[in-house]
């Protein structure tokens, strides 16, 4: 069965059209109308090997927050939908990714219990403007929105970093690498990887 999802979400603040394939090769077509976010979501697709198409627009004349948040919500929902009953997945994964002076570690559990813990960001990171429109605080908000709507437990730890762009990119790439292995089918797993029999 194909592990794919296609979700369209429309509100008074944004229009999101997102399609993904968990068993892809990392092909992406991203246009969120927020250039730095395009860069991050392209990296997420590329390094997770999830084929990802996003066409999004919204009230960015007010702020990019609504479009960024709603895109993350839909990505999380699509991830949950594509995972289906979660039979055969590896479930747990972690990845540590550097980008020059920055280093980020992501740990993922596709548990069905949404949780997100972010730690280690340097002081003032949340106030930094990255790429002209994207604040450091939005990185955490994106991670939380993905985790809550995908039903996954995510721990993101910034281990080192000075440049806000590098820190954010290391975080997105670490999440990508962790997702790549967590969603992968393990041929040795029979059924759902939980002693409860359900996730």
Swiss-Prot record:
It comes from the Bacteria. Its main location: cytoplasm. It catalyses: D-erythro-1-(imidazol-4-yl)glycerol 3-phosphate = 3-(imidazol-4-yl)-2-oxopropyl phosphate + H2O. It is an enzyme of class 4 (lyase). GO terms for cellular component: cytoplasm. The keyword Membrane does not apply. GO terms for molecular function: imidazoleglycerol-phosphate dehydratase activity. It is found in: Cytoplasm. Pathway: Amino-acid biosynthesis; L-histidine biosynthesis; L-histidine from 5-phospho-alpha-D-ribose 1-diphosphate: step 6/9. Its EC number is 4.2.1.19. GO terms for biological process: L-histidine biosynthetic process. Keywords: Amino-acid biosynthesis, Cytoplasm, Histidine biosynthesis, Lyase. Belongs to the imidazoleglycerol-phosphate dehydratase family. PANTHER family: IMIDAZOLEGLYCEROL-PHOSPHATE DEHYDRATASE, IMIDAZOLEGLYCEROL-PHOSPHATE DEHYDRATASE HIS7. This is Imidazoleglycerol-phosphate dehydratase. It comes from Bifidobacterium longum (strain DJO10A).
């Amino acid at each position: 069965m194909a592990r794919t999802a296609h979700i369209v979400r429309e509100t008074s603040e944004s229009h999101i059209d997102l399609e993904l394939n968990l068993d892809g090769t990392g092909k992406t077509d991203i246009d969120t109308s927020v250039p730095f976010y395009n860069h991050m979501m392209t990296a997420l697709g590329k390094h997770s090997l999830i084929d990802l198409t996003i066409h999004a627009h919204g009230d960015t004349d007010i702020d990019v927050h609504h479009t960024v948040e709603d895109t993350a919500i839909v990505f999380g929902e699509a991830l949950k939908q594509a995972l289906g009953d979660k039979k055969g997945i590896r479930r747990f994964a972690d990845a540590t990714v550097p980008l020059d002076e920055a280093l980020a570690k992501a740990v993922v559990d596709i548990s069905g219990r949404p949780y997100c813990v972010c730690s280690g960001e340097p002081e003032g990171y949340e106030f930094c403007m990255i790429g002209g429109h994207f604040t450091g605080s939005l990185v955490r908000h994106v991670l939380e929105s993905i985790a809550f709507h995908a039903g996954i437990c995510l721990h993101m730890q910034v281990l080192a970093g000075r440049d806000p762009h590098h820190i954010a990119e290391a975080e997105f790439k670490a999440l990508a690498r962790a997702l790549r292995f967590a969603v992968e089918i393990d041929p040795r797993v029979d059924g759902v990887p939980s002693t409860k029999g359900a996730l």
